[in-house]
Amino acid sequence: MSLKEQLGEELYGQVLAKLGEGAKLVDISDGSFIPKEKFDAVNSEKKSLEQQLTDRDQQLQELSTKATGHDELSAKIADLQKANEEAKQAFEAEKQQLKYEHALETALRDSGAKNPKAVKALLDTESIKLDGDKLLGFEDQIKALKEQEDYLFKGTEPNGGVQGTPPPGKGADLGGLPTKKNPFKQGPDFNLTEQGILFRENPELAKKLQAEAQ
């Protein structure tokens, strides 16, 4: 049973209204980022809806007591209680996912990523866990990515050079350009995501690497 079916059209619509037109409550984990104001609004709305579910639980419990001896009514109440519990669990899981996505977005922006969504695609997000306010496993991956793909980040690069100008000896195999591998070259380095980022962020570099890969 979907979350929409569990909550009903009215409650589900309230949350969608907070997310904005075209949003899908169950699609928070698809990689799209959520602005802080929307995060706060939806998080507040979730708390309100969770309270409504708790109130329903209490009402169903009271009805269950009164329905003693009425098997059919008791069975229907039991089904409603089960659906209510599933809805609460779905709310909790989705709230945690929302917090995770918001924390990851913030961490990516703080890391200096030029395009947070593109950099996220290069991370193993399955191994990054949210523990309270900390993202476990994020720093190690970002550090490694900055060393390997420094052109994806703003400011001074971790290899010691200034963005777009690597120190002597760095990227020599690619004409002195700030990258250690060619994403256009067939083989283990071939990467369509990085190609797209290069064409958007540095078209000249993209053309040069593309020509060298032929």
UniProtKB/Swiss-Prot annotation:
<dbReference type="Pfam" id="PF06810">
    <property type="entry name" value="Phage_scaffold"/>
</dbReference>
<dbReference type="GO" id="GO:0019069">
    <property type="term" value="P:viral capsid assembly"/>
</dbReference>
<feature type="region of interest" description="Disordered">
    <location>
        <begin position="154"/>
        <end position="190"/>
    </location>
</feature>
<keyword id="KW-0175">Coiled coil</keyword>
<comment type="subunit">
    <text>Homodimer. Interacts with the capsid protein gp13.</text>
</comment>
<comment type="function">
    <text>Scaffolding protein involved in the icosahedric procapsid assembly. Coassembles with the capsid proteins to form the procapsid, in which the scaffolding protein is found within the external shell of icosahedrally arranged capsid protein subunits. In a subsequent step the scaffolding protein molecules are released from the procapsid.</text>
</comment>
<protein>
    <recommendedName>
        <fullName>Capsid assembly scaffolding protein</fullName>
    </recommendedName>
</protein>
<comment type="similarity">
    <text>Belongs to the SPP1-like scaffolding protein family.</text>
</comment>
<dbReference type="InterPro" id="IPR009636">
    <property type="entry name" value="SCAF"/>
</dbReference>
<keyword id="KW-1188">Viral release from host cell</keyword>
<keyword id="KW-0118">Viral capsid assembly</keyword>
<feature type="coiled-coil region">
    <location>
        <begin position="36"/>
        <end position="105"/>
    </location>
</feature>
